[in-house]
Amino acid sequence: MKTVLDVLKGKLIVSCQALENEPLHSPFIMSRMALAAAQGGAAAIRANSVVDIAAIKQQVSLPVIGIIKRDYPGSEVFITATLKEIDELMTVNPEIIALDATARPRPNGQTLESFVGQIRARYPSVLLMADIATLAEAKEAQALGFDCVGTTLYGYTAETQGHSLPENDCEFLRDVVAAVSIPVVAEGNVDTPERAARCLALGAHTVVVGGAITRPQQITTRFVAAIEAHSIDRA
């Protein structure tokens, strides 16, 4: 029988997220965004918050990668940072839970190893995705028993600031694929169909695209920037 990860091999995952300061922030809107993604051929949805996931699951039957973004004092870790978020997510049964698996200090000084152990003890069947930013973190995630690893946070930590996944023909992605045997999820700044296809060609198991599909304000900004640059060139 195929597992969720088997089903996602070579496919597109669409991230449907809008934070409180964004114009599309609404469980209803995110559920419709997920429906549009499903109709377009997406194989799964990545979503933030219990209310959004519940609404999305009413609209589509696709697997969901669930997260909860929540800030904690004294820690830069905010993606599914503690067991509290895991407990909340499990009330809506996402097929996969993604969490920050970087080496940064976690809330309450907890180690990643301890956190994973808590999750496995309480919810032994849930699939776990490690959101990482470095090669060492990818290797550690595999050692800790994560089911898959994503390049989600590359360029978003102090150690990797200034970098982005597409640079040098996705060099970081290629390095991660070579370093681990668990499925690698390409995620982060995959902003064109060609880049998504390239990630898969380079060995990614599956690819997540978010803002380039589901954040109209970002898409509009890119168009405006290109038009303004063209206008300057012609001036």
Swiss-Prot record:
The leader peptide range reads none
Q: Which reaction does it catalyse?
A: an N-acyl-D-glucosamine 6-phosphate = an N-acyl-D-mannosamine 6-phosphate
| Regions annotated as coiled coil | none
UniProt-listed InterPro entries? Aldolase_TIM (IPR013785), NanE (IPR007260), RibuloseP-bd_barrel (IPR011060)
**EC number per UniProt:** 5.1.3.9
User: Could you tell me which pathway this protein works in?
Assistant: Amino-sugar metabolism; N-acetylneuraminate degradation; D-fructose 6-phosphate from N-acetylneuraminate: step 3/5
Quote the CDD domains the UniProt record gives: NanE (cd04729)
**One Gene Ontology term of the molecular function aspect:** N-acylglucosamine-6-phosphate 2-epimerase activity
What's an example Gene Ontology biological process for this entry? N-acetylneuraminate catabolic process
Under NCBIfam families, the record lists: PRK01130.1
Q: Which family does it belong to?
A: Belongs to the NanE family.
Q: What is this protein called?
A: Putative N-acetylmannosamine-6-phosphate 2-epimerase
Q: What is the lineage of its organism?
A: Bacteria, Pseudomonadati, Pseudomonadota, Gammaproteobacteria, Enterobacterales
